[in-house]
């Protein structure tokens, strides 16, 4: 059976708030192992206004932040980390294969 989290439960785990809370739901996770999360991306996201007008794509740095927040949920949902903050220290040789766009 899948473990899922709604936005309120995610907000109990992560310190991020709008507009920088970049995951909307967790479909499944195993504490300390993995997390499958989603961000509902719509055409009116604030970052689309300048990135890029007429051809909006999610900025790569926000894609990395979405991944970091997803990983943080996998770590911070463990009882021993309740109330802690996870920090993503760095990333090397990141490649983006396809752009993320609004539907």
Predicted region positions:
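Hydrophobic beta-strand-centered segment that forms part of the acyl-chain substrate-binding groove
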Residues: 2-4, 70-103
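Short Pro/Gly-enriched beta-strand edge/turn motifs at strand-loop
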Residues: 4-10
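Beta-strand-rich interaction surfaces with strong enrichment in secreted/lumenal proteins
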Residues: 11, 54, 96-99
């Amino acid at each position: 059976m899948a473990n899922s989290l709604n936005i309120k439960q995610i907000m109990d785990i992560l310190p991020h708030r709008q507009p920088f809370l970049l995951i909307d739901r967790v479909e499944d996770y195993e504490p300390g192992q993995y997390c499958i999360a989603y961000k509902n991306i719509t055409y009116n996201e604030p970052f689309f206004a300048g990135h890029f007008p007429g051809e909006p794509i999610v900025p790569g740095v926000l894609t990395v932040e979405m991944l970091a927040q997803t990983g943080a949920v996998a770590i911070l949902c463990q009882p021993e980390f309740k109330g802690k903050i996870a920090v993503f220290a760095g990333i090397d040789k990141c490649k983006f294969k396809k752009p993320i766009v609004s539907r």
